[in-house]
Amino acid sequence: TRRSSDLQLIVLISKPPAPGIMQKVLACARQCEKPVVVHFLGADEHSLQYEGVIPALSLRHAAEIAVATLEGKKAPKETSTRESLLAKARDSIGAMAAKQKDIRGVFAGGTFCYEAQLALLAAGLSCESNAPVRGATELRSRQQGTGHSLVDMGDDEFTQGRPHPMIDPKLRNARLLSEGRDPTTAVLLFDIVLGYGASADPCATLLPVLDTLRQEAAQAQRHLLLIAHVCGTEDDPQDRQQQIECLEQAGVLVADSNIEAARLAAFVALQRK
């Protein structure tokens, strides 16, 4: 691979490997003749300080570094949450009922669920998940979240005998409905994943669910904040911009990345403590 004339850069993304394996991977990366951007989710940044290896702090940061490196620019600092999103979140906080304090995350992408947990923990929040990272706890109930809970709907327990939620979102949408109806839920956090093989129009089945949740919350004198991000490119068959616009028209705060969405949710939860 390192001798390929077409290859310009390598990006390594993984959940943190065992220390011994990580050292071997990084030693191999250091020998590459091409730049190597590395993001091991949850790994200590200092453990990635190897000559020839460029550490990234998030999935988005890894992409930003890769683009900058290919353009001959200096590796950028990690992007902060946009003030426009923070302002909209502040407006929503004031409309919430007293019991609304929790983040409920429902993810089709397991890596996004993992990264979101890390973001909550970094903000000083405890959380639970069916796929907990170090520092998080197991779900107390597989059917319904309690406190701040983030569920990976692509986990084996949800996909045995049925399509992955990226392909068929029925089970994911049902979980969104269940978590959004909980009177303690302040933020409903989710992802939309585009690409070949994924649902042809994710928003088509999702929007009725979000509309139902909004109406029920209003009737109960609650305000449910919806936060999402769309993973994909303009070359994907689902039309990324159209999916974003549909979500925004439905009142969803659409972040540029999963890490921005998770940090925005954490910001709200900290204000609701």
What are these regions (language model features)?
Residues 1-4:
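Short, small-residue-biased leader/transition segments that mark boundaries at the very start
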Residues 7, 15-20, 192-200:
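Glycine-rich, proline-tolerant flexible connector loops at the mouths of alpha/beta enzymes
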Residues 8-9, 187:
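Residues at the N-termini of beta-strands
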Residues 9-14, 25-28, 33-40:
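Signature of multi-pass transmembrane helix bundles
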Residues 17-22, 233, 237:
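Phosphate/ribose-phosphate-bearing ligand recognition and processing surfaces
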Residues 31-36, 215-225:
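A short helix->loop->beta-strand "cap" motif at the edges of active sites that frequently abuts
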Residues 34-198, 202, 225-255, 261-273:
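ATP-dependent carboxylate/acyl-activation modules
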Residues 202-209:
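Charged helix-capping and loop-helix junction motifs
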